[in-house]
């Protein structure tokens, strides 16, 4: 969805932030597919950032994938300077977290998976923080659990009042697994 958005909106040099970059899969793929893009990958985990760095080196995009340790969008200091914020944030609710197979629960850091009782603690913060960094017309794209959570996230974006074109997209397994929204122009 992000690649199509860049093409239809003719963004010549996309400035992208991948929040919760983890291994760098999204950041590295976007840099590889969009040769003029500059991607900032943010994570609170130093270990994750090291893995992302290795993956960017391996795929030859390290010069356009910058990495920063921080909480959500805190490393982005300039307001309205980003074209796209992408994230696969922690979105599992407590019940779903408890039902995961033990090998998943025990392998992945809990903070990378669970977003609190309803799974949306990080998503709520990311919606609010994105308003500060996205340029007018910029795109927010997040992976979510789908199902009822998709409708809830769409409602959160609408309630924020700064987003338009809120759309839920399916993945191969379920509807509503990715949500995209464009930020409205500022009214200042």
Positions of predicted regions on the chain:
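Conserved SAM/SAH cofactor-binding pocket of Class I
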Residues: 1-99, 147
């Amino acid at each position: 969805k992000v690649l199509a958005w860049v093409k239809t909106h003719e963004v010549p040099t996309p400035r992208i932030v991948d929040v919760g970059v983890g291994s760098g899969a999204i950041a590295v793929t976007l840099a590889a597919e969009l040769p003029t893009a500059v991607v900032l990958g943010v994570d609170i985990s130093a270990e994750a950032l090291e893995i992302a760095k290795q993956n960017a080196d391996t795929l030859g995009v390290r010069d356009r994938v910058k990495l920063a340790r921080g909480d959500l969008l805190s490393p982005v200091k300039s307001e309205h300077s980003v074209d796209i914020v992408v994230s696969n944030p922690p979105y599992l609710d407590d019940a779903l977290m408890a039902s995961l197979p033990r090998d998943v629960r025990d392998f992945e850091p809990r903070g990378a998976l669970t977003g609190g009782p309803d799974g949306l603690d990080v998503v709520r913060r990311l919606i609010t923080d994105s308003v500060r960094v996205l340029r007018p017309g910029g795109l927010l794209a997040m992976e979510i659990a789908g199902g009822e959570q998709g409708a809830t996230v769409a409602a959160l974006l609408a309630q924020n009042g700064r987003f338009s074109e809120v759309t839920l997209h399916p993945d191969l397994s379920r509807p509503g697994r990715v949500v995209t929204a464009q930020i409205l122009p500022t009214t200042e």
